Amino acid sequence: MARVRGRKLIKKLKKDEFHPEDNKTHDEPTVSHVNETAGGDNSDVSPNTFFGVLDSGELDYFKKAESTLAIDTFENPDEKYQFINSVIEESKGKELKLATSQISSKLMERIIMESDETQLKTIFKAFNGFYFNLACHKYSSHVLETLLVRGAAQVEKELLTPDFDSVDEGEFVTTESLFLFLTNELQPNLRFMVSHQYASHVLRILILVLSSKTLPSTVQNNSTLRSKKSKIARKMIDIKDNDNYNKIFKTPDSFKVVLRSMLSSIYTSFTHGIPQGSGHFSEISLADVMKFREICVDKIGSPVIQLVIQVEGIFDRDRSYWHLIFKDSDEKDPKEESFVEYLLSDAVGSHFLQNVIASTRIKYVERLYRLYMKDRIPKLAKRDTTAAFVLQSLLKVLNSKEVKEIMDELVPDLSVLLNSNMDFGTEIIDASIRHDNYLRDEIIEQLMKKYYPRESSDKNILESCLQLSSSTLGNTRDDWPTAEERRKSLFLEKLIDYDDCFLNSTIDSMLNLPAERLLQMPYHGVFSHVVEHVLQVKRVAIIKRKLLLNVLCKDIVNLSCNAYGSHIVDKLWTFTAKLAMYKERIATALCADSEKVKNSVYGRQVWKNWSLELFVRKRYDWKKIVKEQELEMFPDSKPLQPKTFKRPNNNNNSDVSPSFKKSKFQKK
């Protein structure tokens, strides 16, 4: 069929193209942002309200208080409680100044994390009426996030173990009701918070708390809670998460009601009052759909919409937010096609699509795959910074038939795809395992072709996968290892677990290294895990076990006293099974330098794991433990060298076995 040409067609295609606005502003709200019922006439207050600054004396006091809490040298919990109480008492009337100050906001976060129920409620009440202002501020937004997480833990505590004594004392306000005051105050400005640089983070935490989802860490690299800059800053100021993070808290039914109201409010703010539900989808204007799609690819608003799509199924069976973005028809839509193409080629858009398809119904994902991605899988796979991640997500969520279709397209070019995206290898291996080892042999062939080609004379999987020669191996600086080395190391460990050929290739590559170079690996924070991972006694041949042990035994004492190497020495306890000579050689070397080993915190653990006290004092009992280990690991094994009979004496000049020699009483 000839290609369709013409100016009208080009004009139509340009009209259907998705072009998000580049100069979007996130400065001022377009609606009243403080609920009048939250206290006072605050409807005309700007979200960037200035609450004043502390004088020099107050600033010095609060800086010293922050340092005291950071050092945490209190003799007992009661002393710490009294100190926090005195700081809270001193800060009365100055809470808003403290929260919006770059220096003293750290103090507020520490106090919130260390406070008890009464102190926490005091802070909630101090912020009442100004939650929206605090959410929109660079520093106080972090304080508010910490307050929400700590408050979630307190709500669960009140729910599971209600305290009736506080009612008798006149204190009857629960943390649940304080949360409801907060959400009521933020309700009129939820649309603005979605795309605000700081308030969006507060909104995400609030949605996670109300929906009883896991509250992620604020400092981990893979945390979805804060931006990269925020996580780095949090590490620099040395505020560690307490036990309230990386947990799911039970919440009352009122939280679900509030969350439903919040999601409905956000939805109607984007659709000009049209309510949720499949019966109203046709009433939404195209302009509103396009505006919402722009929020989906906005670097600030996109994470919020991802989270909303993740939790909307709790209340809305029609998935109104999903259908505000994507259609439900079986036919292609030009504008939707343009939008999906933008998602597949944009960094923010591909991240959005990757996450939402992992949290919605499979039939919606299948529709997008069938209409817009199925016919061009190889081309999309080459977009290694965008669409490639979407394909990896599809491999996880689609049904078996579609996954096999994708694998049929990707596996023949896997060795090439790995050049730019190592994660493809991991996802394809996992997909193969989930679907009865589909294309297993072809995958292994492609991986070997990439990392250990048979025809190459200088093949080395450590070099091809880990780039060992240009790595930080052997460096003594504090900034190693790198994140990239960690990724490569984890991938090689994945290959080792996948098939024995990768295990043997890794061991062969290690043995081809100079002994000094190989002995550097156990001291490396990342590559030591690779060495530890190959020490699998049941999968490695005896001869290769001996060759590895010959190298590792050269520096066994120093290894046992090292943070990383000690794990390898522990692993050698099982790796030397049925190799009693090597086991005794290691034990003897450690005992010969027992003072050095016992003076090291890591060495003491090795000493304990190897039962070296028994080796020194009761050698027979130690050998009994060794024998029991061998029988447990190899119950059906035979001795490595079968017992042989004594050879007959050659001086007899006879070819007959001694057992068959004639007796002197036998007849000749």
From Swiss-Prot:
RNA-binding nucleolar protein required for pre-rRNA processing. Involved in production of 18S rRNA and assembly of small ribosomal subunit. Coiled coil: none annotated. The keyword Repeat applies. It comes from Kluyveromyces lactis (strain ATCC 8585 / CBS 2359 / DSM 70799 / NBRC 1267 / NRRL Y-1140 / WM37) (Yeast). Residues 14-30 have a biased composition (Basic and acidic residues). The lineage of its organism: Eukaryota, Fungi, Dikarya, Ascomycota, Saccharomycotina. SUPFAM superfamilies: ARM repeat (SSF48371). PANTHER family: NUCLEOLAR PROTEIN 9. This is Nucleolar protein 9.
